[in-house]
Amino acid sequence: VEQLQRLKSEFGASRYLTEARRQALAQELRLNEAQIKIWFQNKRAKLKKANGLRNPLALH
């Protein structure tokens, strides 16, 4: 639960992480960098999909 809150907090601050920030976050949360990277990728994709559904008139 704490890991998820921390990830959400980081995502709120910035949707993209630098390599150094990803490494620090991975160490802090005891996850590997790939897990952090994938979580951010999935979160961005989910957000993009949700925004697309809310605006059906947007050009794709």
From Swiss-Prot:
Keywords: Developmental protein, DNA-binding, Homeobox, Nucleus
GO process terms (BP): neuron differentiation
Gene Ontology CC: nucleus
GO molecular function annotations of the record: DNA-binding transcription factor activity, RNA polymerase II-specific; RNA polymerase II cis-regulatory region sequence-specific DNA binding
Annotated localization: Nucleus
Superkingdom to which the source organism belongs: Eukaryota
DNA-binding region(s), residue ranges: 1-41
PANTHER family, A to Z: HOMEOBOX PROTEIN ENGRAILED, HOMEOBOX PROTEIN INVECTED
Entry similarity comment: Belongs to the engrailed homeobox family.
Name the UniProt record assigns to this protein: Homeobox protein engrailed-like B
Organism expressing this protein natively: Myxine glutinosa (Atlantic hagfish)
Lineage: Eukaryota, Metazoa, Chordata, Craniata, Vertebrata
